Amino acid sequence: MNERVKQVASALVDAIQKTLTEQRVTEEEWRAGVGYMMKLAEAKEVAVLLDAFFNHTIVDLKAQATRGSRPAMQGPYFLEGAPVVAGALKTYEDDSHHPLVIRGAVRTDDGAPAAGAVIDVWHSTPDGKYSGIHDQIPTDMYRGKVVADAQGKYAVRTTMPAPYQIPNKGPTGVLLEMMGSHTWRPAHVHFKVRKDGFAPLTTQYYFEGGDWVDSDCCKGVAPDLVMPTKTEGGAQVMDIDFVIERAREHV
């Protein structure tokens, strides 16, 4: 027997049973719910629904315990093996979206420069798709690895990402709409910062005033992840300093 599994699973079962009783759920409604769960599995949207409703809670718990930068959900579109880039992510030749410069420094939780830290950067195409996932877009586009220099500094150029909808024709989208919500995520950029001996930092940053920033369907937007509008030389700028914490030994 696994005591932790017993503890968490029992609490979940108790909470569901309490809700069924308090809401006086009918047998017809119960059967509809069972059917919905079967459709969710058939549509391969279990992870989508869990991300939309619960992932932000897990991230908030992690944020309370970290000494580093605020984490955020990874999402389903991270791919290992992105190319190391020098200066810019690869984008469509006809990408007319506003240029974006992302720059800053990576430091350890004791304030030292995190020289050689590797930063995975990935974001949507101008039409809200992800390379390597949608429409056979080559995996080396709109994603790449940036290596911090001896002072922990990094910089990369790309273009502005776009808001997009999570799958909205399947069970998850149907449920969100029945609840009076929507299926839109605001434009954002994902980051995963890694360095030997340190805990990986997975996070994402948003744009002040952007569509859906105040009503993200996945509830992933925290105030300190929203970047103010700043432009230089015709490009929008995100100044982001990351703090990574030393990996903790598990006894």
Curated annotation (Swiss-Prot):
Chlorocatechol 1,2-dioxygenase involved in the degradation of chlorinated benzenes, that occurs via chlorocatechol intermediates. Displays broad substrate specificity. Preferentially cleaves 3-chlorocatechol and 3,4-dichlorocatechol, and shows lower activity on 3,5-dichlorocatechol, 3,6-dichlorocatechol and 3,4,6-trichlorocatechol in vitro. Is not able to convert 3,4,5-trichlorocatechol and 3,4,5,6-tetrachlorocatechol. Pathway: Xenobiotic degradation. GO terms for molecular function: catechol 1,2-dioxygenase activity; ferric iron binding. It comes from Pseudomonas sp. (strain P51). The gene is tcbC. This is Chlorocatechol 1,2-dioxygenase. It is an enzyme of class 1 (oxidoreductase). Fe cation binds at Y130, Y164, H188, H190. One of its GO terms (biological process) is catechol-containing compound metabolic process. InterPro entries: Catechol_dOase_N (IPR007535), Chlorcchol_dOase (IPR012817), Intradiol_dOase_C (IPR000627), Intradiol_dOase_core (IPR015889), Intradiol_RC_Dioxygenase (IPR050770).
